[in-house]
Amino acid sequence: MTSATIPGLDTAPTNHQGLLSWVQEVAELTQPDRVVFADGSDEEFNRLAAELVEAGTLKKLNEKKHPNSYLALSDPSDVARVESRTYICTEEESGAGPTNNWMDPTEMRSIMTDLYRGCMRGRTMWVVPFCMGPLGVEDPKLGVEITDSEYVVISMKVMTRMGKAALEKMGDDGFFVKALHSVGAPLEPGQKDVPWPCNDTKYITHFPETREIWSYGSGYGGNALLGKKCYSLRIASAMAHDEGWLAEHMLILKLISPENKAYYFAAAFPSACGKTNLAMLQPTIPGWRAETLGDDIAWMRFGKDGRLYAVNPEFGFFGVAPGTNWKSNPNAMRTIEAGNTVFTNVALTDDNDVWWEGLEGQPEHLIDWKGNDWYAGKTETPAAHPNSRYCTPMSQCPILAPEWDDPQGVPISGILFGARRKTTVPLVTQARDWQHGVFMGATMGSEQTAAAEGKVGTVRRDPMAMLPFLGYHVGDYFQHWIDLGKNSDESKLPKVFFVNWFRRGDDGGFLWPGFGENSRVLKWIVDRIEHKAGGQDTPIGIVPKAEDLDLDGLDVSVDDVAKALAVNPDEWREELPQIEEWFEFVGEKLPTGVRDEFEALKQRLSEAG
């Protein structure tokens, strides 16, 4: 088929010639049955959802329990981000750095063009315009995803500001990131479709220099919703490096003191370290309140007043379901209960409700994420996939901060780095200054989770929780952080802290209860920012004593809190060779400033006896 004979190409609702010529070029390559520009309307969402129910991709859930909500079960081979098939294709291999897979851009384009040839046959090609962040900003970060997946279209409506308004924002010549996606499953005439089309061959490719994303073979979240990690972190981190800002894997939290003073925090945690739970915190200490602005991504720029301001580029939550419950995260549960949610790979109850491991009230019988019968106490495999998800609108969150859609963003008082560590790392540590904070973030290590491929439980370095999401060389990224600090007024920079909710005692149990009780740690952090709280200088930074924390009403022994806060120089000396090994991996682009902090740490540990 030529472009002249592909229905929909001649009725595009835009005069943007750059967009139109790209859409035509992709249509001629991929050969869809028709082209449709998504408008982002509720009517479109409902129509597509109904079609996906008819096709067997979605199941409509119990309207009383989850209004306008659906469950999708993926192909068992397509359940998570595929880091082994994720590429950063810079002109020079050194541009991608040692943390990324690299291929020559010309070679990659050739391979993927062959894969794309005819790949949308028998399908509809959707043109999905979207905006990352509030539509009202001076310099909106726009994108267009071309996809052959209706699941992607409805998910993009939840996760981004998608459709007509974003297309209008582009005008006739506005810049946009080109994001091309196909499940790689063409249909021959008369061929029956499968509920979850995908391909064994997968590529999730980024071209940072030309701001393009090409994805093939996967229908799953992070590989297919290209506004998510692909744009808002991998491409945006390269943009941020070039333009002098930060695109980070961070939640944004607003904490309000009993005096009604607001503090805003950005916090970076690797997957499954409690990021969403902290973003939707319910403080347990009287008089303190929390509101959320985002649970996954923060874009931060310096304002005219010299402070660092953050916006959340996303429009929805794409959270891990297992472990989410009325105790760990009641606000996530309330957000989901409000409806308009697409669940993926959770279990289905007999009354068309959803269930996952960790959720209260385990039923006797379920249909598991593979579509099989599951019986409590008898079936040995999990009912929900460990990386199963809910995709739900942010606007439904009961503790959403009113500033969530403010183009100016919010001024950040503190940056938190965190990780999942059983030993060594205290409950909370304050960095001595910005550069020391960069060192803390650069050397983060966390135990592996189910959100990515790899062995669960092993510790891997995950700098600023950005290891899988950097769009350029990790050493240049560290230098970018240091430079932003050097070029700023230090008195206006956010204070930097490191937290670890997951330290364990000798009996293997958690020393700190976590969840809402983490507000006690945040209170100490606020008091440090206000120069009100005590803390002891240790070789690794400033750490509170147990009595420096507000422990009123906490059902944990002071002894356990002290153990959670302990700094053991011997354990930290064991950490040093691992950090050295990580720095060798980063290579010659490791900034001098980060190396200096490491040498200073070694010196302080040697003096600690």
Curated annotation (Swiss-Prot):
Organism superkingdom: Bacteria
Residues noted as binding GTP in the record, renumbered to the chain: A272, C273, G274, K275, T276, N277, R389, R420, F515, G516, E517, N518
Keywords on record: Cytoplasm, Decarboxylase, Gluconeogenesis, GTP-binding, Lyase, Manganese, Metal-binding, Nucleotide-binding
Catalytic activity: oxaloacetate + GTP = phosphoenolpyruvate + GDP + CO2
Pathway: Carbohydrate biosynthesis; gluconeogenesis
Family matches, as InterPro entries: PEP_carboxykin_GTP_CS, PEP_carboxykinase_C, PEP_carboxykinase_GTP, PEP_carboxykinase_GTP_C, PEP_carboxykinase_GTP_N, PEP_carboxykinase_N
Annotated Pfam families: PEPCK_GTP, PEPCK_N
Keyword Calcium in annotation: no
GO molecular function, one term: phosphoenolpyruvate carboxykinase (GTP) activity
Record: residues binding Mn(2+): K229, H249, D296
GO cellular component terms given for this protein: cytosol
Required co-factors: Mn(2+)
Location within or outside the cell: Cytoplasm
Thylakoid listed as a keyword: no
Active site positions, chain numbering: C273
Protein family: Belongs to the phosphoenolpyruvate carboxykinase [GTP] family.
Family matches, as PANTHER family: PHOSPHOENOLPYRUVATE CARBOXYKINASE, PHOSPHOENOLPYRUVATE CARBOXYKINASE [GTP]-RELATED
Protein name, as recorded: Phosphoenolpyruvate carboxykinase [GTP]
